[in-house]
Amino acid sequence: MSIVLTGVCQAYSGFELRDVSFEVSAGEIVGFLGPNGSGKSTTLRILLGLERPARGTALIEGAPYARLSEPMRTVGSILDAQWIAGGQTVTQYLTWLAIAGGLDRSRIPVLLEQVDLAYAAKRRVSRLSLGMRQRLGLAGALLGDPRYLVLDEPLNGLDPEGIRWFRDLLRQLRDQGRGILLSSHILSEVSAVADRVVMISDGRVTGSGSLSDFEAEGSLEDAFFKHLAPKDR
């Protein structure tokens, strides 16, 4: 089973997502790259059921997100760690997520240790740095022990030590058999962890293949600029 997007289209004033198709299989990290405004976040929102595509399908293990019987056990996500309600403590936020998703709250202390936030368990979210909120967002994404992760710019706000920690954790999660879709503008980090890469520019997929295929063009950075649509150059 896998995440499969087929012919996904969406249109807004001045922007069009056109026939986006790619797959994320279990046990692999797929880097999702593109310039600002290229359609990355819109694609992820459609995948997670936050928007409906005008055409095409976005399926997780054969079903759209809205029809998953246990969504948080199937896919975890980070879209924007800054939105997390600031009035709650770290533990209260994860407890709320667990109750909402019908999940076991006993995993919360273990996850806080895993993301190195146990020391901040009683701290209000409003007092967390962006990097700490990213760690909290990851704990929330892992709360249901999901088979897939969808991560949108999860490295924002992390210091160099935090980025290295996150890189190692992603590899561990992949080696446990999880499929991971990683959207990031930090090309060096995508290059360090991705098995495959999907590039999107001006609303359409401009390249898709193994990391080694793209690096054969010189480097992932070279390939990124080579695959930009004329509008984004």
How would you name each of these model-derived features?
Residues L48:
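Helix-to-loop junction immediately C-terminal to a conserved catalytic motif
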Residues G56-P71:
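Conserved ABC transporter NBD signature motif
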Residues T95, I99, R105-A120:
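Conserved ABC ATPase "signature" region
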Residues L138:
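Hydrophobic anchor residue at the start of the ABC signature
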Residues L149-E153:
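Catalytic Walker B motif of ABC-type/P-loop ATPase nucleotide-binding domains
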Residues S208-G209:
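ABC ATPase "signature
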